[in-house]
Amino acid sequence: MYPVDLHMHTIASTHAYSTLHDYIAEAKLKNIKLFAITDHGPDMADAPHYWHFMNMRVWPRLVDGVGILRGIEANIKNLDGDIDCTGPMLDAIDLLIAGFHEPVFPPQDKAANTQAMIATMAQGNVHIISHPGNPKYPVDIKAIAEAAAKYNVALELNNSSFTHSRKGSETNCRAIAEAVRDAGGWLALGSDSHIAYSLGIFEHCERIIAEVNFPQERILNVSPRRLLNFLEQRGRAPIPELAGL
């Protein structure tokens, strides 16, 4: 089991069912050392308000040895790669992941989807692209992986894509892992938990990693320090409270 989970939702996204406290309790049970709460960006119909993200500063950084990152799963909005996390929100966020969601960016053809995803990475704010293997949004996988390596953006293997969501993702996810491996990029693992019990569960991601012989040294979830170093390399200030993780 990896000690870091980078994608989950709380009851602030009203189609999810757990609180921050629930995730802390589950992390302690599973020996998860660091996680990021990444509720949906405000352009989603049931997403938290802008104020929710701005007020995450009241969250403790460390509770009972568990580190907490303030995150968002922003929505890619258009072909220019704009997202619904801008201005002061960017300074309130530790970890910014972004992806396609149908209510905000309806599926388009492969060329358009690829253009939008690469443009999002090129803007320089996003750290991780969420569930890029969604078959509803076909992309040029080689081009996406090479762009991710160029812009130092991780592509996600999303465990939920193999279970409850985005049916038919497995072939794409395997191809993405192979392409990221070949491009020398970063892979991020996300449970995409909508309830705390699935925190830190990456069994399907781990199977793909083994099948394609993906190098552990290019997976952000291997340790809290690796993830924090990545964020610092991307320009985020060090978080003193998490220095000992």
From Swiss-Prot:
Residues reported in the UniProt entry to bind Zn(2+) 3: E73, H101, H131
Known EC number: 3.1.3.-
Record has DNA repair as a keyword: no
GO biological process: one example: bacterial-type flagellum-dependent swarming motility
Binding site for Zn(2+) 1: H7, H9, E73, D192
Gene Ontology molecular function: any one: phosphatase activity
Disulfide bonds: none
Matching InterPro entries: Phosphatase_YcdX_put, PHP_dom, PHP_phosphatase, Pol/His_phosphatase_N, Pol/histidinol_Pase-like
Cofactor(s) this protein cannot do without: Zn(2+)
Superkingdom field: Bacteria
One cellular-component annotation, GO: cytosol
Gene3D superfamilies in the cross-refs: Metal-dependent hydrolases
Keywords from the UniProt entry: Hydrolase, Metal-binding, Zinc
UniProt-annotated binding residues for Zn(2+) 2: H15, H40, H194
Free-text cofactor note: Binds 3 Zn(2+) ions per subunit.
HAMAP family, sorted: YcdX_phosphat
Family: Belongs to the PHP family.
Quaternary state and interactors: Homotrimer.
Protein name: Probable phosphatase YE2421
Species annotation: Yersinia enterocolitica serotype O:8 / biotype 1B (strain NCTC 13174 / 8081)
Lineage summary: Bacteria, Pseudomonadati, Pseudomonadota, Gammaproteobacteria, Enterobacterales
